[in-house]
């Protein structure tokens, strides 16, 4: 019988769940089915658990408030429009969710370099881990959702130091600038709270892994 991995601890499983949640919320707009899941008692209990960390609580509370207010088609469409304007349409009012835009000196926020070095590096890492970008997600591999999903998978299979090195390089190094850009451009409250929550969570996690 195979012994369980030493990395399959409750703490690492909880970390993986946080990263999966963040990845899912950045991957696409919230539809009715996803909203029902996010409004469920189980999901709300998980949000409450996250809010138990004082540095995460303000952003978690905003996310919960917005989710509670999403009760009709119009409100969901408005939130979808926020997502589209921030992450799908380029230009000055967007907040492109690609690591390469922030990690390459020649990055151009209006015309980001897509499928660049960070995309290639992530593709190699995904292949090495026998993972890949889903065919129904036509985005470069350095999209924030892909990187967060990769960390979720690695949370229970890599040792702490290896995780810390990856998170520091591929997330923590650019999320502060990304979160500021989302906060400056988001016409609503949800995605700027999500971006700040992600940035703070990653920073705290990176610090804990490196301790």
Swiss-Prot record:
Gene3D superfamilies: 1.20.120.1820, HscB, C-terminal domain. Involved in the biogenesis of TorA. Acts on TorA before the insertion of the molybdenum cofactor and, as a result, probably favors a conformation of the apoenzyme that is competent for acquiring the cofactor. GO terms for biological process: protein complex oligomerization; protein folding. InterPro entries: Chaperone_TorD, DMSO/NO3_reduct_chaperone, HscB_C_sf, TorD-like_sf, TorD/DmsD_chaperones. It holds the Pfam family Nitrate_red_del. It is found in: Cytoplasm. Its main location: cytoplasm. This is Chaperone protein TorD. Belongs to the TorD/DmsD family. TorD subfamily. One of its GO terms (cellular component) is cytoplasm. It comes from Shewanella loihica (strain ATCC BAA-1088 / PV-4). Keywords: Chaperone, Cytoplasm.
